[in-house]
Swiss-Prot record:
Zn(2+) binds at H30, C34, C37. This is Anti-sigma-W factor RsiW. GO terms for molecular function: metal ion binding. It is found in: Membrane. The lineage of its organism: Bacteria, Bacillati, Bacillota, Bacilli, Bacillales. Its main location: membrane. It is a single-pass membrane protein. Residues 1-87 are cytoplasmic. The gene is rsiW. The keyword Transmembrane helix applies.
Length: 213
C-alpha cells in the first residue's frame, strides 16, 4: 500500500470510533478510489470483528488449586533457613542456649565427686557433710555440691544442694521448691540431683544475673 500514512491513521481512528464526520467523508472518498486501501481496511475491520465475537475462555473450576497442588513442595531446610533469616535475634538466642546447655551437660557428666562449698567462714566441713553450727547465722546464699548440709544454726539466704541432701538435727528435710522461715533457712531450699534440674538452675541464674544489671 503506497498511499499516505494519513489514510492508515484515519482507518485506525475510524475503527476506534473517534473519527470526525469530515475525516470519515475524506476516508470514504479515498477508499472508493483506492483498491489497496479498501482491501487493507476490510482486513482490519474483519480482524476486529473476529476478536470481539470470540468467547471469553475461562479456566475450569479448581484449575488454580490443582496447579498449586502439583507444584513441588518446598523443602523443610529452605523453610528453616528463611525463618532463621527473618528472626536473627531468636536464632542467636537459641544457639546460645544450645551451647550453654551442652557445656553444662559436659560439666555434669565429667564433674568429679569432690565436695564443693560456698566460701562462708561460718561453715564447718566434716567429711562429705557441711555443718551450719548451732547459734551461728550464715549470711548470704549457701551452695553445697556432692555433699550434705546439716542445719544446726541459721542460713540467712537461699540454700542449694547438688547431689546431696539437707539435714536438720534428726532427719532429712525435703528441700525441693520449699520456702522456709523455720528450721534454719530464711530463704529458698532447693535440691538438685538430675541433669535437667542442673541445666535449668544455671540458665535461671544466668538470666537473673543479666537482668540484675
Amino acid at each position: 500500500m503506497s498511499c499516505s500514512k494519513d489514510y492508515l491513521n484515519l482507518m485506525h481512528i475510524y475503527l476506534d470510533g473517534d473519527i470526525t464526520r469530515e475525516d470519515e467523508s475524506k476516508l470514504s472518498r479515498h477508499l472508493e478510489d483506492c483498491e489497496s486501501c479498501q482491501k487493507h481496511f476490510h482486513e482490519l475491520n474483519r480482524t476486529i470483528t473476529l476478536m470481539r465475537s470470540a468467547e471469553r475462555v475461562e479456566a475450569p473450576d479448581g484449575f488454580t488449586e490443582n496447579v498449586m497442588a502439583n507444584l513441588p513442595s518446598e523443602k523443610k531446610t529452605v523453610k528453616y533457613r528463611r525463618w532463621f533469616k527473618l528472626h536473627p535475634m531468636w536464632t542467636a538466642a537459641a544457639i546460645f542456649l544450645v551451647l550453654m546447655a551442652g557445656g553444662m551437660i559436659s560439666t555434669w557428666t565429667h564433674s568429679s565427686d569432690q565436695l564443693v562449698v560456698s566460701a562462708q567462714n561460718e561453715l564447718i566441713v566434716d567429711g562429705d557433710t557441711v555443718i551450719v553450727p548451732a547459734g551461728v547465722t550464715v549470711p548470704g546464699d549457701v551452695l553445697v555440691k556432692n555433699g550434705d548440709l546439716l542445719l544446726l544454726g541459721t542460713v540467712d539466704g537461699d540454700v542449694t544442694i547438688f547431689n546431696g541432701k539437707i539435714l536438720d538435727n534428726d532427719s532429712e528435710m525435703n528441700g525441693e521448691g520449699l520456702m522456709a522461715s523455720v528450721g534454719g533457712v530464711n530463704g529458698e531450699l532447693e535440691t538438685i540431683d538430675r541433669m535437667f534440674e542442673w541445666i535449668w538452675y544455671n540458665i535461671k541464674n544466668f538470666f537473673k544475673g543479666v537482668f540484675s544489671f
